Amino acid sequence: LFSRVALSFGENGKFSHLPNDQRWARVKAGESDPGLDALFFQYARYLLISSSRPNSPLPVALQGFFNDNLACHMGWTNDYHLDINTEQNYWIANVGNLPECHLPLFDYIKDLSVHGSKIAQDLYGCKGWTAHTTSNPWGYAAVSGSILWGLFPTASSWITSHVWTQYEYTQDKNFLKETAYPLLKSNAEFLLDYMVTDPRNNYLSLIHISEPTRPY
């Protein structure tokens, strides 16, 4: 898997004799080091390869599996944050030519959509499925935490965009039929039920949501 991709900006080895902390300090000071960019690209691929493979029981979480109980004492307890963190873990999957490393995330989204269908109906009276800012290994899909950042029913749409990205890169028609389209269709049904028509312009608009990063 790792050998599938080579990335060079022409000067990859120019500063390779330096420790990485010194290279990083040079870049922060305004110096150029294209090789460090290539190194970080490959490091991201390495992290995903080492933590997310076909048949992995779960996708990559905030801290990974090896926390020595530390995660239990953190505010986010090594969960799944669907507002950006989980997505960021998988941004490298397709651009890094690692489509099979994406698969544990899709298995998780399918499970999440089952729980999210009940939340869509019970909480919003809507068809389809939804999920909010935080989730866990059991597919938790309801609102949690502060309403300032927890009431984010479009988190499901954000995480589901990954199935479309996978299809765009792979053009796998069977994946589109069996996995991507059902998830996208059901989530779109939720959005169509959830949105309201703005009388000022007749556009469909979202009812109040709390976008988690807005306060920052």
Label for each model-derived stretch:
Residues 42-43, 146, 200:
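Short, well-ordered loop/turn elements at secondary-structure boundaries
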Residues 66, 131, 206:
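Short clusters of hydrophobic/aromatic residues that line enzyme substrate/ligand-binding pockets
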Residues 45, 49-53, 63-67, 71, ...:
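An acidic- and aromatic-residue-enriched active-site/binding cleft used to recognize and process polar
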Residues 1-79, 98-119:
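Acidic/polar, glycine-enriched structural segments that form the non-catalytic walls/loops
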Residues 207-216:
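Single conserved hydrophobic/aromatic residue that forms the stacking wall/gate
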Residues 75-196:
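Aromatic-rich carbohydrate-recognition surfaces in CAZymes
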Residues 40, 82, 199:
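Extracellular/periplasmic catalytic domains that process cell-envelope and extracellular macromolecules
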Residues 198-206:
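Flexible glycine/proline-rich, aromatic-decorated loop/lid segments
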